[in-house]
Swiss-Prot record:
Catalytic activity line of the entry: [trehalose-6-phosphate synthase]-L-cysteine + S-adenosyl-L-methionine = [trehalose-6-phosphate synthase]-S-methyl-L-cysteine + S-adenosyl-L-homocysteine + H(+)
Temperature dependence (free text): Optimum temperature is 30 degrees Celsius.
A GO MF term: methyltransferase activity
Disruption phenotype: Exhibits almost 50% reduction in intracellular trehalose concentration.
Protein name, as recorded: Cysteine methyltransferase
GO biological process terms on file: methylation
EC nos: 2.1.1.318
Activity vs pH: Optimum pH is 7.
Domain of life assignment: Eukaryota
Length: 130
Protein backbone atom coordinates (compact mmCIF):
# COMPACT_ATOMS: atom_id res chain seq x y z
CA UNK A 1 0.00 0.00 0.00
CA UNK A 2 1.02 3.61 -0.49
CA UNK A 3 2.26 5.23 2.68
CA UNK A 4 0.37 8.37 3.64
CA UNK A 5 2.44 10.84 5.66
CA UNK A 6 -0.48 13.22 6.16
CA UNK A 7 -2.68 11.02 8.31
CA UNK A 8 -5.61 13.42 8.53
CA UNK A 9 -6.30 13.14 4.81
CA UNK A 10 -9.00 10.55 4.36
CA UNK A 11 -9.04 8.40 1.21
CA UNK A 12 -11.29 9.75 -1.53
CA UNK A 13 -10.81 7.68 -4.63
CA UNK A 14 -11.76 8.61 -8.14
CA UNK A 15 -13.95 5.92 -9.68
CA UNK A 16 -14.12 6.07 -13.45
CA UNK A 17 -17.39 5.25 -15.24
CA UNK A 18 -17.93 1.97 -17.06
CA UNK A 19 -17.48 3.43 -20.53
CA UNK A 20 -16.25 6.52 -22.33
CA UNK A 21 -14.00 9.33 -21.21
CA UNK A 22 -13.64 11.04 -17.90
CA UNK A 23 -12.18 14.52 -17.65
CA UNK A 24 -10.50 15.41 -14.40
CA UNK A 25 -9.41 18.70 -12.94
CA UNK A 26 -6.93 18.46 -10.09
CA UNK A 27 -6.53 21.71 -8.20
CA UNK A 28 -3.41 21.87 -6.06
CA UNK A 29 -3.52 24.60 -3.46
CA UNK A 30 -0.88 26.17 -1.27
CA UNK A 31 -1.46 23.96 1.76
CA UNK A 32 -1.14 20.80 -0.32
CA UNK A 33 2.00 21.74 -2.21
CA UNK A 34 3.59 23.34 0.85
CA UNK A 35 3.91 19.81 2.24
CA UNK A 36 6.30 18.95 -0.56
CA UNK A 37 9.98 19.13 0.35
CA UNK A 38 11.79 22.10 -1.17
CA UNK A 39 13.87 19.87 -3.43
CA UNK A 40 10.88 18.09 -4.94
CA UNK A 41 9.80 19.50 -8.29
CA UNK A 42 7.75 16.75 -9.87
CA UNK A 43 4.47 14.97 -9.35
CA UNK A 44 3.22 11.57 -10.41
CA UNK A 45 -0.30 10.34 -11.03
CA UNK A 46 -0.49 6.67 -10.09
CA UNK A 47 -3.26 4.29 -11.05
CA UNK A 48 -4.04 1.76 -8.35
CA UNK A 49 -2.95 1.52 -4.73
CA UNK A 50 0.24 -0.49 -5.04
CA UNK A 51 3.82 0.82 -5.19
CA UNK A 52 4.21 -1.08 -8.45
CA UNK A 53 1.26 0.71 -10.05
CA UNK A 54 1.73 2.21 -13.48
CA UNK A 55 1.48 5.88 -14.37
CA UNK A 56 -0.89 7.87 -16.53
CA UNK A 57 0.40 10.08 -19.35
CA UNK A 58 -0.87 13.57 -18.64
CA UNK A 59 1.58 16.04 -20.10
CA UNK A 60 4.39 18.03 -18.51
CA UNK A 61 2.94 21.51 -17.96
CA UNK A 62 1.64 22.37 -14.50
CA UNK A 63 -1.23 24.27 -16.13
CA UNK A 64 -1.60 21.88 -19.01
CA UNK A 65 -4.37 22.41 -21.53
CA UNK A 66 -3.45 19.18 -23.27
CA UNK A 67 -5.72 16.24 -22.56
CA UNK A 68 -3.94 13.05 -23.61
CA UNK A 69 -6.27 10.15 -24.30
CA UNK A 70 -5.59 7.26 -21.96
CA UNK A 71 -5.53 3.92 -23.74
CA UNK A 72 -2.41 2.36 -22.25
CA UNK A 73 -0.40 2.76 -19.07
CA UNK A 74 2.67 4.93 -19.48
CA UNK A 75 5.16 6.47 -17.09
CA UNK A 76 5.12 10.25 -17.35
CA UNK A 77 6.06 12.95 -14.91
CA UNK A 78 4.41 16.31 -14.28
CA UNK A 79 7.21 18.76 -13.58
CA UNK A 80 6.59 21.69 -11.26
CA UNK A 81 10.17 22.91 -11.25
CA UNK A 82 12.48 24.73 -13.62
CA UNK A 83 11.78 22.34 -16.48
CA UNK A 84 8.24 23.70 -16.61
CA UNK A 85 9.39 27.30 -16.28
CA UNK A 86 7.96 27.63 -12.79
CA UNK A 87 9.40 28.70 -9.47
CA UNK A 88 8.69 27.58 -5.92
CA UNK A 89 6.26 30.47 -5.42
CA UNK A 90 4.49 29.95 -8.73
CA UNK A 91 3.95 26.27 -8.14
CA UNK A 92 1.93 26.80 -4.98
CA UNK A 93 -1.28 26.86 -6.97
CA UNK A 94 -1.87 24.82 -10.08
CA UNK A 95 -4.78 23.26 -11.90
CA UNK A 96 -4.12 20.28 -14.12
CA UNK A 97 -6.57 18.79 -16.58
CA UNK A 98 -6.36 15.22 -17.85
CA UNK A 99 -8.64 12.95 -19.83
CA UNK A 100 -8.75 9.21 -19.42
CA UNK A 101 -10.53 6.60 -21.49
CA UNK A 102 -11.19 2.93 -20.96
CA UNK A 103 -8.07 0.80 -21.31
CA UNK A 104 -7.95 -2.84 -22.24
CA UNK A 105 -6.93 -5.92 -20.29
CA UNK A 106 -4.54 -5.22 -17.44
CA UNK A 107 -4.41 -1.56 -18.52
CA UNK A 108 -8.09 -1.01 -17.75
CA UNK A 109 -8.27 1.66 -15.04
CA UNK A 110 -12.04 1.89 -14.72
CA UNK A 111 -13.05 1.93 -11.07
CA UNK A 112 -9.42 2.05 -9.97
CA UNK A 113 -8.18 4.44 -7.26
CA UNK A 114 -5.80 7.16 -8.43
CA UNK A 115 -3.27 9.05 -6.35
CA UNK A 116 -1.22 12.17 -6.90
CA UNK A 117 2.26 11.66 -5.47
CA UNK A 118 5.35 13.80 -5.15
CA UNK A 119 8.27 11.43 -5.28
CA UNK A 120 9.50 8.09 -6.54
CA UNK A 121 8.95 6.58 -3.10
CA UNK A 122 5.23 6.97 -3.68
CA UNK A 123 4.48 9.29 -0.77
CA UNK A 124 0.89 10.34 -1.17
CA UNK A 125 0.12 14.05 -0.90
CA UNK A 126 -3.40 14.17 -2.31
CA UNK A 127 -5.94 11.87 -3.87
CA UNK A 128 -7.81 12.70 -7.04
CA UNK A 129 -11.38 13.91 -7.01
CA UNK A 130 -14.03 14.78 -9.54
Amino acid sequence: MIHCKVQQWSPQYLRLPATGYEELTLTLNTSMLARMPEEEDQLFLVVGDSPSSTYVDWGEDCNSTRYPSYDHCTHKILYLGASAGTTRSKRLSATIGIRLSKGTGSNNVLGTPMYLLYNEMKTRIIESSK
